[in-house]
């Protein structure tokens, strides 16, 4: 992955292992790439980045082995992985004069299924000054969301989590940019409710950024019957639906990276030393 990413035009955020056969012999917490900022930026923009992230791992092989024992994870999280790669390539191919004024940091975390290992490591040992990250946009399972996947599903469906928790400004921006899309998506906020039994706010990589007071937005089309099953296969992905979510995330990243100032944090910051409890009040527009 890291070697092939070099061809999209963005800079790796660390040492590149060119032989994937050796990866399993060493600890790997994340793949990090950077799309350099454009021109004519202010000092505040020059020193800041926006992060677009995803988790790279699925839960892989089921036990005991049977005829089909490989959980390929097409949606969880192949969909998010390729989406972030596509967005990174879109910005990397852009002429520098047209690029956003802040740099964009693209991160593929590993170990999400094991307890958010990769995102915890990256946020504790950030490849850029942590205080320079103005916002984090997280994508995990963005390839389904149809009526056949969940009762409230439809071709415009996407769940948003955390978008108003730390920054009303960021949440409002996501709403505005969605309305500006040729065909707006329909946001479902029910899983963002504090105390929701699915506890989505605490279960994906965005939380390790939020615990340091970085405004986040989590995009997902939600759980479905093939979640963590051997049937999570590519033929069930709604590709155009996924592409529309990708376009919205790219639009949000562009806007955040071009703003004169970072999104205002007006929500309650979590204690980074404590476990996530999902009891804080979410701010709604």
Stretch-by-stretch model annotation:
Residues 1-3:
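Short, small-residue-biased leader/transition segments that mark boundaries at the very start
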Residues 15-20, 66-77, 108, 156-165, ...:
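Second-shell loop/turn segments in exported
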Residues 16-51, 55-116, 249:
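Alpha-helical metal-binding/catalytic segments enriched in His/Glu/Asp
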Residues 220-285:
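His/Asp/Glu-rich mid-to-C-terminal helical/loop segments that flank catalytic regions of hydrolases
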């Amino acid at each position: 992955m890291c070697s092939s990413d070099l061809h999209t035009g963005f800079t790796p955020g660390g040492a590149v292992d060119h032989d994937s056969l050796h990866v399993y012999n060493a600890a790997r917490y994340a793949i990090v790439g950077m799309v350099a900022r454009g021109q004519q930026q202010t000092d505040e923009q020059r020193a800041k980045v926006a992060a677009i992230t995803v988790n790279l791992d699925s839960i892989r092989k089921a036990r005991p082995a049977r005829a089909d024992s490989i959980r390929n994870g097409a949606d969880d999280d192949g969909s998010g992985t390729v989406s972030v790669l596509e967005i990174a390539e879109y910005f990397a191919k852009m002429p520098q004069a047209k690029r956003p004024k802040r740099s964009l940091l693209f991160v593929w975390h590993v170990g999400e299924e094991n307890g958010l290992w990769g995102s915890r490591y990256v946020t504790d040992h950030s490849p850029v000054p942590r205080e320079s990250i103005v916002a984090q946009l997280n994508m995990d399972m963005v390839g389904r969301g149809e009526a056949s996947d969940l009762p409230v599903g439809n071709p415009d469906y996407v769940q948003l989590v955390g978008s108003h928790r730390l920054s009303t400004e960021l949440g409002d921006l996501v709403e505005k940019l969605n309305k500006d899309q040729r065909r707006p998506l329909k946001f479902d906020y029910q899983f963002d409710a504090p105390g929701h039994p699915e506890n989505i706010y605490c279960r994906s990589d965005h939380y390790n950024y939020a615990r340091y007071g970085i405004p986040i937005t989590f995009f997902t089309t939600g759980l479905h019957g093939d979640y963590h099953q051997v049937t999570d296969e590519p033929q069930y992905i709604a590709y155009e639906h996924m592409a529309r979510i990708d376009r919205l995330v790219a639009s949000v990243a562009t806007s955040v990276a071009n703003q004169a100032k970072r999104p205002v944090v007006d929500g309650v910051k979590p204690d980074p030393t404590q476990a996530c409890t999902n009891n804080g009040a979410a701010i709604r527009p």
